[in-house]
Amino acid sequence: MTQKIIGVAGFKNSGKTTLVEKLVIALTQQGYRISTVKHAHHAFDIDHEGRDSFRHRRAGATEVAVVSNSRWAIIHELRGDAEPPLQTILEKLAPCDLVVVEGYKRDAHDKKRTINFIVLVEKKR
């Protein structure tokens, strides 16, 4: 099955995340299974110093899986490798009804499969 994708792109503080949030709320309330992908233009951490998973990464692990009875996550350290293209990330997602992608406006993903919402605001003068 081909993934259905909605892409949300625009300038910083233009309402992208708010739009994604409202789309996800509306669609999940209708019973759809939604996944999201957020492109970050900066480094980020989902674990913190002192946590076991942080210590595993600091020790040199390329991937660290953190698993509990309510969620799980895999943290992948690039360690100098190139950032993966959107398609690579999409292939790692579990099956769902729709993927909402925030960002990746410069990525060469298959835009024929994507409905793009472009969110723009006027620059303040």
Task: Kindly label every feature range from the protein language model.
Residues 5:
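Walker A (P-loop) ATP-phosphate-binding motif of ABC ATPase nucleotide-binding domains
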Residues 12:
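The conserved Walker
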Residues 98-125:
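Phosphate/Mg2+-binding loops and adjacent switch elements
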Residues 16:
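Conserved lysine of the Walker
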Residues 8:
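Hydrophobic anchor at the beta1->P-loop junction of P-loop NTPases
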Residues 24-87:
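N-terminal phosphate/diphosphate-binding loop that engages ATP/GTP or pyrophosphate donors
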